[in-house]
A protein has these predicted regions:
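Conserved donor NDP-sugar-binding/catalytic core segment of glycosyltransferases
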Residues: 95-127, 131
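Acidic donor-binding segment of Leloir-type glycosyltransferases
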Residues: 20-61
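Short aromatic/hydrophobic "clamp" motif used to bind/position activated sugar donors
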Residues: 83
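A structural helix-start
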Residues: 9-17, 37, 41-42, 93-94
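The conserved acidic donor/metal-binding loop of glycosyltransferases
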Residues: 87-91
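A recurrent flexible, glycine/aromatic-enriched loop bordering the glycosyltransferase active site
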Residues: 118, 141-164, 173-176
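N-proximal low-complexity "stem/linker" segments adjacent to membrane-targeting elements
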Residues: 1-25
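Glycine-rich, basic loop-to-helix element that forms the pyrophosphate-binding segment
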Residues: 62-78, 99, 153-157
Length: 176
């Protein structure tokens, strides 16, 4: 298996549903999904179970330890060569893996990240928050969505990393 999507989640079953739905639309299917519930009081297990017939999906529920440790927990259980780490509120375009695959064939990268932008269905408030987070006038220098190979500034809501590199680096910090 080439790719493992690692999805830490805390009290977001509706967003997990949207993300998993977007994964069913991927044009490349060589992936598994690892959903790790981080001690949620509003679990997403029923949502995950609804996708068991359409995705190679694994669900884990553990005590709350924060997003970094939850990502590490997921990576430990994943089988892919590349770990694609997403936040639970991501929605991927159907060509996401196709573009990742093309870039990895062109440039052999051990780690990579992608831009973020507001989905067209977002409310005006959500779009304003997105602007504040991605504008050149705020943090756009880091999160500005440039499409070029450059220094890697990890943003854990949309990042990929070769599993062996992740393990060599020790994963995410134990800090909360």
């Amino acid at each position: 298996m080439k790719y493992s999507f690692i999805i830490p989640v805390y009290n977001r079953p509706d967003e997990v549903d949207e993300l998993l739905d977007s994964l069913t639309r991927q044009t490349i299917r060589d992936f598994e999904v690892v959903v790790v519930e981080d001690g949620s009081s509003i679990p997403c297990k029923d949502v995950v179970d609804n996708y068991a017939d359409r995705l190679s999906i694994h669900y884990y529920n553990k005590e709350n330890s924060g997003p970094g440790q939850t990502r590490n927990y997921g990576v430990e259980r994943a089988n892919g060569e590349y770990m694609l780490i997403l936040d639970s509120d991501c929605i991927l375009p159907e060509n996401y893996l196709k573009e990742v695959e093309a870039e990895l064939q062109y440039k052999k990268a051990d780690a990579f990240g992608g831009p973020d932008r507001a989905h067209e269905s977002f409310t005006d408030v959500q779009k304003a928050i997105n602007y504040a987070m991605t504008s050149f006038f705020t943090t756009g220098g880091i999160r500005g969505g440039k499409k070029k190979l450059d220094k890697f500034y990890p943003r854990s809501f949309n990042m990929g990393i070769r599993k062996e590199v992740y393990q060599a680096l020790g994963g995410f910090s134990k800090m909360r």
